[in-house]
């Protein structure tokens, strides 16, 4: 199937490793030019170099999305350097390992305000696209309690719930100006350096319990999420608006009407 993505332009946040990197790589594999950001310069440049090796225009910068002024300035610069914008993937998230009020503040500024700043800054550019798409990366933690055993799990889950609600609400208005908004909510996704990797080191029995809860018989991989995101980003999903897709290997037990 031709996803009709070749030559399009995308911004992916939090894309130096894990899910974000795999999303950027999968977009690049479809011929999409990609701008990425994350907090660590060396990781960003390594990721961007890998994307360029896929034969597309790609660049990245060290940006803290929680710093709204710096982030919005980078977004404007990224659009200019890309020469336009078709796809915005808000993937960045605050670490659920941050406890207490600091974790709540970081989750609010990164997950929620990061999405708001991204949408507010990029809407005028996306409106110029013939097939504009926004994809938020949330989590099944936004609709379930105590999915991830981490000190900042409460803030993490609440911020993802807010992100799901925000995405669903703006999807109705932005669709009227040609911008589709959808949400992907991952279940337990394992990758080196990720939250479930930390669970494996600290409490391997919890990792095994999560694996057993996935009826498909394994934890997810970043590629599982990237596949869903790239579908939502493509014109092939042009009749899909405001959806929250659970990609969780059957982890959730309730019926999602």
Describe each region flagged by the PLM:
Residues 6, 230, 241-257:
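Short C-terminal tail/terminal secondary-structure segment
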Residues 16-18:
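Conserved glycine-rich cofactor-binding loop
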Residues 42, 62-74, 223-224:
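The beta1-alpha1 cofactor-binding region of Rossmann-like NAD(H)/NADP(H)-dependent oxidoreductases
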Residues 53, 176, 186-214, 254-257:
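A glycine/serine/threonine-rich, flexible loop-to-helix segment
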Residues 94, 101-120, 135, 163, ...:
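Catalytic Tyr-X3-Lys loop
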Residues 94-99, 135-162, 167-176, 188-189:
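Catalytic loop of short-chain dehydrogenase/reductase
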Residues 110-130, 142, 171-172, 176, ...:
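Amphipathic alpha-helical dimer-interface segment in Rossmann-like NAD(P)H-dependent oxidoreductases
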Residues 175, 180, 240-242:
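Short, small/polar-rich loop/turn modules that mediate ligand/substrate recognition or access, typified
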């Amino acid at each position: 199937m031709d996803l009709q993505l070749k030559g399009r332009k995308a911004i992916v946040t939090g894309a130096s490793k894990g899910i974000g990197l795999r999303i950027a790589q999968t977009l690049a594999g479809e011929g999409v030019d990609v701008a990425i950001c994350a907090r660590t310069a060396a990781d960003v440049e390594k990721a961007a170099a890998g994307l360029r090796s896929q034969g597309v225009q790609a660049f990245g910068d060290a940006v803290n999305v929680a710093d709204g002024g710096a982030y919005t300035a980078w977004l404007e610069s990224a659009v200019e350097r890309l020469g336009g914008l078709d796809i915005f993937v808000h993937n960045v998230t605050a670490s659920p390992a941050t406890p207490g009020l600091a974790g709540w503040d970081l989750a609010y500024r990164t997950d929620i305000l990061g999405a708001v700043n991204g949408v507010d800054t990029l809407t005028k550019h996306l409106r110029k696209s013939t097939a504009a798409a926004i994809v938020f990366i949330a989590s099944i933690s936004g609709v379930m309690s105590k999915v991830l055993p981490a000190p900042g799990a409460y803030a993490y889950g609440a911020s993802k719930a807010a992100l799901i609600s925000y995405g669903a609400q703006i999807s109705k208005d932005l669709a009227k100006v040609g911008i589709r908004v959808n949400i992907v909510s991952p279940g337990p996704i394992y990758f080196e350096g990720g939250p479930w990797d930390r669970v494996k080191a600290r409490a391997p029995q919890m990792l095994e319990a999560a694996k057993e809860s996935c009826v498909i018989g394994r934890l997810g991989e970043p590629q599982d999420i990237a596949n869903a995101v790239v579908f939502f980003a493509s014109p092939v999903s042009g009749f899909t608006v405001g959806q929250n897709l659970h990609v969780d290997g059957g982890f959730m037990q309730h019926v999602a009407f």
